[in-house]
């Protein structure tokens, strides 16, 4: 399992390395990384809503299991935000990014492809549920970032600005296609797939570019906090909650794999769009990717405690 996961994720590290080398040799710079991340945030995220939410198998949703995941995600979000704000004295917007990064997993490009080959359709649905509902949680985080970016709070202006919120646009488009059973022509489907496939390369090359720049000790400490929360605390709290309520850990295995996955790209994407420091995010990305190779393998191969 480890070797399979390692070689399947090797191209991801390759993309980061390409960005890193490009940054070191001044082929690409921070401005270029912002263009890549803006492309992901404003174009690819809404398109992912069409692809994922529009084709979701809602009849198999396990809302109880998702609630326990969301509860854990909320705890980690709050911890990440509070540590950044209270202990490290970071600004409100940066604290939101730290909370987002600590609690959002790279489920779409890290766990989901593995699950497609290793699990049955019903076991994959919990991952699809998390991916779909994260459009709401990401959208709410973007609302908070928008609020933090205004010196004077004008709720009317903030409300209108949410008409351009990429996550909410993706959610709206996906739900519209699903509820009205809109048939998408093959040519449009191909366009959607082309756009979505660009997401990972753009985000990881941008991460590599930003990684090539030096940072301060505070950002390094924050990157370790994010990694600790995401790779260790998140799955431990998730396991504790499920074990405490006597939940079948075999049914929740894919959900646990998402909990142990590396950080997602949304924190980095919207940090760049809202001009928030990204140094801690990019460094925690590399560390969490390496550690997730071990954590996900352990969760996949470990027997359920209730089976022993």
Predicted regions and their residues:
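Extended, polar beta-sheet/loop recognition surfaces of beta-rich domains
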Residues: 308
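Alpha-helical transmembrane segments of multi-pass small-molecule/ion transporters
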Residues: 1-305
């Amino acid at each position: 399992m480890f070797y399979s996961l390692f070689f399947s994720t090797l191209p991801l590290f390759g993309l980061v390395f390409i960005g890193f080398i490009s940054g070191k040799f001044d082929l690409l710079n921070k401005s270029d990384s912002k263009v890549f991340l803006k492309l992901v945030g404003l174009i690819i995220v809404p398109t992912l809503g069409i692809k994922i939410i529009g084709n979701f198998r809602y009849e198999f949703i396990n809302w109880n299991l998702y609630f326990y995941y969301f509860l854990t995600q909320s705890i980690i979000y709050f911890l990440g935000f509070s540590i950044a704000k209270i202990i490290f004295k970071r600004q409100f917007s940066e604290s939101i990014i730290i909370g987002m990064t600590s609690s959002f997993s790279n489920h779409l490009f890290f766990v989901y492809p593995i699950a497609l080959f290793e699990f049955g359709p019903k076991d994959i649905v919990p991952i699809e549920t998390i991916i779909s509902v994260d459009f709401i949680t990401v959208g709410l985080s973007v609302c908070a970032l928008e609020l933090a970016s205004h010196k004077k709070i004008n709720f009317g202006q903030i409300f209108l600005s949410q008409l351009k919120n990429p996550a909410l646009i993706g959610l709206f488009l996906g739900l519209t296609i699903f509820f009205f059973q809109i048939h998408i022509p093959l040519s449009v489907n191909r366009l959607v797939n082309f756009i979505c496939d660009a997401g990972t390369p753009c985000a990881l090359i941008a991460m590599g570019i930003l990684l090539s720049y030096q940072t301060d000790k505070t950002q390094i400490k924050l990157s370790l906090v994010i990694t600790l929360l995401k790779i260790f605390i998140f799955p431990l709290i998730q396991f504790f909650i499920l074990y405490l309520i006597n939940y079948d850990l075999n049914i929740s295995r894919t959900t646990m794999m998402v909990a142990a996955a590396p950080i997602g790209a949304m924190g980095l994407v919207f940090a760049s769009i809202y001009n928030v420091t990204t140094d801690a995010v990019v460094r925690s990305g590399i560390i969490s990717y390496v550690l997730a190779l071990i954590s996900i393998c352990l969760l996949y191969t470990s027997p359920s405690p209730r089976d022993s």
